[in-house]
Amino acid sequence: MEIFPAIDLKEGRCVRLYQGEFSKETVMNEDPVAQAIIFEKFGAKRLHIVDLDGAVAGESLNLSVIERICKAVRIPVQVGGGIRSLVAVEKLFSVGVDKVILGTAALYDKTFLEEAVLLYKEKIIVGIDAKNGFVATRGWLDVSEISYIDLAKQMENIGVQTIVFTDISKDGTLAGPNIGQLELLQKSVAIRLIASGGVASIQDVKKLNDMNIYGVIIGKALYEKTIDLEEVLEVTKLC
């Protein structure tokens, strides 16, 4: 199983939100580059970065920070948030990003998504963020009428190889991942799944590993030290 330490960017800082609420923000590190270096130092093999400002604005607003992170670490970095054109995708790849995560565009601009997948194949990941089972977009501010399962099936048909699935109600809560929704997703599509939201303990990670989930994104649990990065990397290596 792949472990993805998370860095959420807002106004150039590393923050955590509670259930996706921008008003419920906690600054975890004023220097996201330093945080990325810390994660790499403790053994991280890859990083997950979200441009929260970009997700709302519809364009990358923390590109310079992302570029500095990519230059500061030697591990692959995947980035999501506000990426809604091929130009934006290419710009991220040009500054050193390894994989790009598309969210809102996956729902509302299938032509762009298809072109991106055709050009970059497995380098394009789709982020599906669900609120009460329905897909949320534009920084989780809008909730659509399409279920996360239906969107996942559409993504599979387009050729997407990896999905990041987030249950918004779990995000930043340390309440444990939504196992039921992940199990249903596994039964519905044969795409690699990266679980995000609510992971609070080594036991949560082991449970996801036992389900053969491809990867897990860990944010708040690392910052609040309910999960030790070195320990979870060792545990998943042995599983």
UniProtKB/Swiss-Prot annotation:
Keywords: Amino-acid biosynthesis, Cytoplasm, Histidine biosynthesis, Isomerase. InterPro entries: Aldolase_TIM (IPR013785), His_biosynth (IPR006062), HisA_bact_arch (IPR006063), Isoase_HisA-like (IPR044524), Isoase_HisA-like_bact (IPR023016), RibuloseP-bd_barrel (IPR011060). GO terms for molecular function: 1-(5-phosphoribosyl)-5-[(5-phosphoribosylamino)methylideneamino]imidazole-4-carboxamide isomerase activity. Its EC number is 5.3.1.16. It catalyses: 1-(5-phospho-beta-D-ribosyl)-5-[(5-phospho-beta-D-ribosylamino)methylideneamino]imidazole-4-carboxamide = 5-[(5-phospho-1-deoxy-D-ribulos-1-ylimino)methylamino]-1-(5-phospho-beta-D-ribosyl)imidazole-4-carboxamide. One of its GO terms (biological process) is L-histidine biosynthetic process. Pathway: Amino-acid biosynthesis; L-histidine biosynthesis; L-histidine from 5-phospho-alpha-D-ribose 1-diphosphate: step 4/9. The keyword Cytoplasm applies. It is found in: Cytoplasm. The active site is at residues 8, 129. Belongs to the HisA/HisF family. This is 1-(5-phosphoribosyl)-5-[(5-phosphoribosylamino)methylideneamino] imidazole-4-carboxamide isomerase. The lineage of its organism: Bacteria, Bacillati, Bacillota, Bacilli, Bacillales. The gene is hisA.
